[in-house]
Amino acid sequence: MATDKKLKCVVVTPERAVLDETADMVILPMIDGELGVQPGRAALVGRLGKGELRLNSGSQVRKWRLEGGFAQVRSDVVTVLTTKVTG
């Protein structure tokens, strides 16, 4: 079943908000492996490891490198708090 629901992804560092976009799927580099988040996912708070944050929208994939931090998923919003983002 196709869905038009999207996730909102917000990435924040101590200096500024780096990203505020929508995506079909967000892949997070958690401390114990990757976590794929799709619309409708149950709420969670987790610790991020160093790795690649990916936003999938249709056939487009955008990537950023994170240096750890924390992620919250709630009501189709993925919030990432990290010290450093590159990409």
Positions of the model-derived regions?
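Compact, glycine-rich, soluble single-domain proteins
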Residues: 8-87
